[in-house]
Amino acid sequence: MPQQRRRKILVAGAGGSIGSAVSRALAKQYEVVALVGSHEQLQEREPAPFLSWRACEPFSRRDVEKVITGCDYLIYLVHTRVPTARMDQAECEDMDLLIADNFARSANRQGVKQIIYLGGIIQGGNISSELLERRNEVAEALSIYGTPLTVLRAGLVVAPGSNAVRLLANIATRLPIVLIPQWADKRQQPIALPDVIRAISYCLTNHETRNTNYDIGGPMVLT
C-alpha cells in the first residue's frame, strides 16, 4: 500500500529562534520548507528529515511564488524591523505590507489551503498603537486574495535565544534602574514557545479555525 504523502508547509520567517523551533517541531508530522532571508543564514542551518531550508528574497514576487509552489499551508512569521539594502528608503510598515502582499498573492495563485499568521498583542499608548495598526494591516494584506487566514495574537513569547528574552535579561542584569514609557507599563500574559507551537498545530488540523482570530497567552498575568 503506497505511503500517504505528507502535507507540505512553508514557514516564512524561519530565521529566528521562534521560526526555527516551529519548523523543526512541525517536521515531525509535515514536510516543511523553512525560509530564511539570506544565503548567509542558510549556511548556518542543517537539514533534517522532512525539513529543508531555503533562502528567499521576500521582495521578489517571482522568488516567493517559486518557493510556495506545491505547499499546502503557509506559516507567516515575518516581521520587518529595519530597512534593507533593497528598500533603504522605505518605512518598515511599507515593507511589511509589500512582503505580505507577495506571499498572499502567491498563496492564492498556488492554491494554498490556509495561512497562519503569528502577530502580537500590544496594549495602550502611542507607540504600541502604531505597531498594532501595522500588524492588523499585515493580517488584512494576507487575507485580501481569499486564502483562509488564521491569526494568532501573542504577547511575549518565551523562547530560548529570542530577541525579547535576551533584551529582558540584559536589562535586568545590567541596569539597576530603568525608565520605561507608559505603554510598556502594562500587564502582560507571556506564553511559552511550546504552547505557541501547539496552537499552530491545532489550527492546521481544525478547519473551524480558518478566517478566525485568537489571542493566546500563558496562565500567568505579569507586570
Describe each region flagged by the PLM.
Residues 40, 47-110, 121-125:
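NAD(P)H-binding glycine-rich loop region in Rossmannoid oxidoreductase-like domains
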Residues 2, 17, 22, 45, ...:
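Oxidoreductase cofactor-interface core, primarily capturing Rossmann-like NAD(P)-dependent enzymes
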Residues 12, 35, 77, 115-120, ...:
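SDR active-site strand-loop-helix element
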Residues 30-38:
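Conserved glycine-rich Rossmann-like NAD(P)H-binding loop of the short-chain dehydrogenase/reductase
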Residues 2-29:
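N-terminal Rossmann NAD(P)H-binding glycine-rich loop of SDR-like oxidoreductase domains
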Residues 38-39, 220:
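Residues in the short beta-alpha loop(s) of Rossmann-like NAD(P)-binding domains
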Residues 8, 72-73, 114:
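Structural motif
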Residues 109-114, 146-147:
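A short helix->loop->beta-strand "cap" motif at the edges of active sites that frequently abuts
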